[in-house]
């Protein structure tokens, strides 16, 4: 069974491109440090998961 695109966490740059809501719902594996370094939007939802 093939995975749909949104079943897999997207890279941070994809989340930024799609917008904040995408990051919340589709980018759960988004690495906070990596995102901050690259200047990407990181939702508070992700910050909590990363232990800030």
From Swiss-Prot:
Record-annotated disulphide pairs: 12-23, 15-27, 22-30
GO annotation, cellular component aspect: extracellular region
Glutamine amide modified-residue sites: 50
Tissues expressing the protein: Expressed by the venom duct.
Keyword flag Disulfide bond: yes
Keywords: Amidation, Cleavage on pair of basic residues, Disulfide bond, Ion channel impairing toxin, Knottin, Neurotoxin, Secreted, Toxin
Molecular-function GO term, any one: toxin activity
Superkingdom of origin: Eukaryota
Record localization: Secreted
Coiled-coil regions listed in the entry: none
Record propeptide residues: 1-4
Domain notes: The presence of a 'disulfide through disulfide knot' structurally defines this protein as a knottin. The cysteine framework is VI/VII (C-C-CC-C-C).
Function in brief: Probable neurotoxin with unknown target. Possibly targets ion channels.
Protein name per Swiss-Prot or TrEMBL: Conotoxin Cal6.3b
Native source organism of the sequence: Californiconus californicus (California cone)
Lineage, broadest ranks: Eukaryota, Metazoa, Spiralia, Lophotrochozoa, Mollusca
